[in-house]
């Protein structure tokens, strides 16, 4: 799935749309975003050595994970990202890097879906 189709499922738009493409791999949703280097969140973080902030990496993962729910998203429901546990950043992400996240549904409890 490419960006234009992703836009039909997610409410985010540039500059906050942080998924370039998505594909299903079995029960996993695999999403990707290529860091171009001109993103607003790199301005000042850090001059001369730009690094994607951790909170932006979390947002990338949240948006990608929301695409797992694409069959439930009908334009009327906006998925809400309510938390993450045990998040660790093992490597810095720089311009030119491709961020890839894999997600699967772990549990459904009423209106809450744990991914």
What spans do the regions from the language model cover?
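Residue-level signal for pocket-adjacent positions within structured domains
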Residues: 1-5, 11, 36-37, 41, ...
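Short Pro/Gly-enriched beta-strand edge/turn motifs at strand-loop
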Residues: 1-6, 97-101
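HotDog/MaoC-like acyl-thioester-processing domains
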Residues: 11, 26-27, 93-97, 104-115
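Catalytic strand-loop segment that frames the active site of acyl-thioester-processing enzymes
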Residues: 13-52
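Hydrophobic core residues within well-ordered beta-strands of beta-rich domains
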Residues: 16-18, 99, 113
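A residue-level signal for conserved active-site and pocket-lining positions in enzyme catalytic cores
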Residues: 22, 61, 103
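Compact, glycine-rich, soluble single-domain proteins
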Residues: 43-53, 57-66, 81
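Hydrophobic beta-strand-centered segment that forms part of the acyl-chain substrate-binding groove
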Residues: 64-106
């Amino acid at each position: 799935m490419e960006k234009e189709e992703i836009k039909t499922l997610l409410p985010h738009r540039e500059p906050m749309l942080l998924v370039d493409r998505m594909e299903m791999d079995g029960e996993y949703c695999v999403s990707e975003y290529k860091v171009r280097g001109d993103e607003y969140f790199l301005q000042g973080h850090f001059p001369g050595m730009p690094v994607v902030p951790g909170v932006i990496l979390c947002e990338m993962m949240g948006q990608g994970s929301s695409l797992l729910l694409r069959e439930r998203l009908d334009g009327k429901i906006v998925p809400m990202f309510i938390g993450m546990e045990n998040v660790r950043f093992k490597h810095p992400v720089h311009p030119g890097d491709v961020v890839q996240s894999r997600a699967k549904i772990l549990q459904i409890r009423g209106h809450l879906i744990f991914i």
